[in-house]
Design a protein with these regions (language model features):
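Family-specific signature for flavin-dependent thymidylate synthase
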Residues: 1-231
Length: 231
């Protein structure tokens, strides 16, 4: 570890942490800086944490036309594409399904996957980007701003405290969004993360092993309790 806290001080810290927010004011004074790239739909949830945080972002308003749009600019790993769907003739999801259909330039009906729609959105965004770069007319800028999907990834530099991280970890550890799980895994890797999570280092290791699946590890205390229960 890059930092070291003596066992007596660490024991005092954990007791104060367990005593509640009023007794662990020191956690508000431990600051963390990080660069995070995440989709706008995740930042919308993160922005509910207003107290004890500061963020500086790459401005979408000013930088939206700075580069060409590609799929790599979006969090789209869960979008269905051709590889994740059955062959066309076996697909039942497109039967008479107008939301998945569109007419191509030849007047033919086509059915699209969600990822294909995102690719089309990229093409449209790039079309208006080129027009905006050529003309500087704001109406083309508006097309990009209002068409931009919430899966667009934005980078921010954030500053927050161990106390804020403790609140995040408690309320978001089992959240539906994968991005929160990734952040909580990162939190567990911070120096003396037991201040944040409330778990001992041994418990954190056991949780990580159990999260792999097909295995369940118990602590020595749990093993003793189980053994006593058999008697």
């Amino acid at each position: 570890r890059p930092f070291y806290i003596g066992p007596n001080d660490l024991n005092l810290i954990m007791n104060l942490r367990a005593a509640g927010i009023d007794h662990r004011k020191f956690m508000r004074m431990i600051e963390v800086y990080a660069d995070i790239t995440a989709p706008l739909y995740w930042w919308k949830e993160y922005d509910t944490y207003k107290v004890g945080t500061v963020a500086n972002s790459c401005s979408t308003m000013h930088k939206i036309a700075a580069k060409e749009f590609t799929l790599e600019d979006f969090s789209c790993e869960h979008l269905l594409d051709e590889e994740s769907l059955p062959p066309y003739e076996e697909r039942v999801d497109i039967d008479h399904c107008e939301p998945l259909a569109a007419i191509d330039v030849n007047g033919q009906w086509c059915y699209y996957t969600p990822k294909t729609f995102l690719k089309m959105t990229c093409h449209v965004l790039n079309h208006f980007r080129e027009l905006y770069l050529k003309t500087k007319e704001k109406k083309y800028w508006w097309q990009m701003i209002q068409l931009l999907p919430s899966s667009y990834n934005q980078k921010r530099t954030i500053m927050l405290s161990y106390e804020v991280l403790a609140n995040i970890y408690k309320s978001r550890r089992h959240h539906k969004l994968d991005e929160w799980h990734t952040l909580c895994d990162w939190i567990e890797g911070l120096p003396y993360s037991e201040m944040i999570t409330g778990k001992s280092e041994e418990e954190s290791i056991i949780d990580k092993i159990n999260s792999i699946g097909n295995v369940y590890v118990v602590s020595p205390g749990e093993a003793r309790a189980a053994e006593e229960g058999k008697r």
